[in-house]
């Protein structure tokens, strides 16, 4: 199978404010990882620790600001890509946020977003799956080990592996 462009799978930790981004660039034909990116993002956690990721204010003290991260992603991967994500709603909002913070227009990117979760769920249901719709359970069905604390780059790589198993 050949996609029209390379696929950039993104994942963020943090819902209200992004505190970490992971990104994995996959070859449009082989889906082999060509490049990757990961960084924490400066944010005010109000002295709370993110329970799912273990990220604290101390972790973020030297992290780049959203604007810098948006510029870094733009310069590293450009816009001639398909953006993909696992449950894309929150990830795309955070991606738009860091791109806008960098003074860039999100419309430079193709508006077609590859959301891997629904494709994975449909694939499993079609093959007799009757388990939970939760990510952990679906990842497990595709052979992933339990994640423990969430890490954006690791989550991108798990999503990439699921995508490969669905389409290759």
Please state what every model-predicted region is:
Residues 151-164:
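Acidic, divalent-metal-coordinating active-site segment for phosphoryl/phosphodiester hydrolysis
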Residues 91-114:
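Substrate-recognition/cap helix-loop segment adjacent to the acidic, metal-dependent catalytic center
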Residues 113-130:
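Short alpha-helix plus adjacent loop in nuclease-associated cores
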Residues 128, 147-153:
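Active-site metal-coordination segments of metallo-dependent hydrolases
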Residues 10, 114, 154:
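Active-site flanking residues adjacent to catalytic metal/cofactor-binding acidic residues
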Residues 1-97, 136, 140-144, 150:
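Conserved non-catalytic scaffold segment of RNase H-like nuclease domains
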Residues 98-102, 122, 141, 162-166:
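Active-site catalytic microenvironments for nucleophilic, acid-base chemistry
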């Amino acid at each position: 199978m050949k996609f029209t462009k390379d696929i950039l799978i993104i994942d963020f930790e943090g819902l209200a404010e992004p505190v970490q981004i992971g990104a994995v660039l996959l070859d449009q034909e082989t889906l082999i990882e060509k490049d990757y990116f990961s960084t924490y993002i400066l944010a005010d956690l109000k002295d709370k620790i993110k329970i799912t990721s273990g990220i604290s204010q101390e972790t973020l003290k030297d992290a780049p600001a959203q604007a810098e991260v948006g510029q870094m992603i733009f310069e590293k991967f450009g816009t001639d890509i398909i953006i993909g994500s696992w449950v894309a709603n929150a990830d795309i909002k955070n991606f738009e946020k860091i791109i806008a913070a960098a003074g860039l227009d999100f419309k430079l990117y193709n508006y077609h977003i590859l959301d891997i979760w629904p494709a994975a769920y449909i694939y499993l249901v079609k093959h007799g799956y009757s388990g939970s719709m939760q990510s952990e359970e679906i990842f497990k069905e595709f052979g992933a080990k339990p994640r423990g604390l969430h890490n954006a780059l690791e989550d991108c790589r798990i999503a990439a592996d699921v995508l490969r198993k669905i389409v290759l």
